[in-house]
Curated annotation (Swiss-Prot):
This is Uncharacterized protein RP225. It comes from Rickettsia prowazekii (strain Madrid E). InterPro entries: DUF2497. The lineage of its organism: Bacteria, Pseudomonadati, Pseudomonadota, Alphaproteobacteria, Rickettsiales.
Amino acid sequence: MNKENKKNQDMSIEEILKSIKGIINERKNPIYDNYSADEDILELTDIVNQNEEENLISTKSASEVEEVFRNFTDTIKDKKLNNNFSSKNALEELVIGMLKPELKAWLDKNLPILVKELVEIEIKKLVQYSKRNDSNY
């Protein structure tokens, strides 16, 4: 008898779903009143020139990267010719050799600015410290 109750219950759920679907289908949706079948066609008439692709990186960046790789390959070639170094330090020497020019360029560009800012900060601290000490006397 339990199975019969469940079967009747399942059938009633199916009937409820069918009636809900019927009601939804009977009602007219106002969103689609002014809709025509032509509106779902998308015409692409603007011609895009595919030859004028925008490069992802600038030519300056590309040339700098090319130079880094050239230095890298030159360093590797030099290391292959000179077998008098220990293999333990080969990678370390390679990295140092590659980073020196980059580090020099970065320091040349940024070190004066960093030093100036740090000196200004320290001078401000000294001035504030001296003002506090002068006001205590």
